[in-house]
Amino acid sequence: MAIAPRGRFAPTPSGDLHLGSLVAAVGSYLHVRSQCGTWLLRIDDLDAPRVVPGASDRIQTCLEAFGLHWDEVVYFQQPQQEHYQAALEQLTATGRVYRCQCSRKQLSQSGDSVSVDGSLRYPGFCRDRQLSSEIEGSDRLNVQNLPAIALEDAWQGRYQQDLAQAVGDFILRRRDRLFSYHLATVVDDARQGITEVIRGLDLLASTPRQIALQQLLNLPTPHYGHLPLVVWPNGDKLSKQTKAPPLDLRQAPALLSQAIGHLGLAMPSDLQGAPVGEQLAWAIAHFPAPRLSKQPDSLS
């Protein structure tokens, strides 16, 4: 018997949602609802220094204003530390985890190449030093000799990456003892039974790292789909860093119409700006768009 799809929207509570966030949320919502699946809300509050007080509550209020009602209870990362620790111990038992003392300054001065996500590719300075776990530092995963990771993305097609060449050994737990986004995401997706990960194109390059962790931890790999980003006219991604304005809940119907349009759906003119429930019902019945662009969609 086929497993009912389970998707999720997992914002970081570092501020309010903006149009780019809304497009990602609506895309993941429509993807699972169009298959009669379950849609979950996860608050990625693991990185405590980035959490803005009250942002989690505002995110939930915002989603409800747009008719994006989630199933089950909201899942928070902060209470899941023991599960991340267990996963790290399981990875350590494979012999692929090592302590690293390299600072960002050292790496920036190393002259090594830039990785696929814009950060520096780790050159492996500490890989063979066999540093004690009692020494202050981060924990990295040795990706040398791992097979290339390939996936079939729902919208971007086939994507392949050799982790050793593309990113190098990556961090599982930071120097400040916070678990990494990649490790936490993999553990959370498995614990929540996520089968569909629909998110922005900026996260495609990080997906092979997550698949590698799933394979090493013997966890299932979800289906992935990476949506084209919403960008400013100059090509910069809409984000908190580029001053994307927070969503105005008073304009929810108009903004939802805009988000649905960014997903390639040509909604009838009489539904433009209609109550959010009516718009979502139509979009669920017509998702996905026959030809969703792979390119970023500029904000007009």
From Swiss-Prot:
Its EC number is 6.1.1.-. Keywords: Aminoacyl-tRNA synthetase, ATP-binding, Ligase, Metal-binding, Nucleotide-binding, Zinc. ATP binds at K240. This is Glutamyl-Q tRNA(Asp) synthetase. A motif ('HIGH' region) lies at residues 11-21. Its cofactor is Zn(2+). Pfam families: tRNA-synt_1c. Zn(2+) binds at C100, C102, Y122, C126. The keyword Cell inner membrane does not apply. Binds 1 zinc ion per subunit. The lineage of its organism: Bacteria, Bacillati, Cyanobacteriota, Cyanophyceae, Synechococcales. L-glutamate binds at R8, F9, A10, P11, T12, D44, Y181, R199. Belongs to the class-I aminoacyl-tRNA synthetase family. GluQ subfamily.
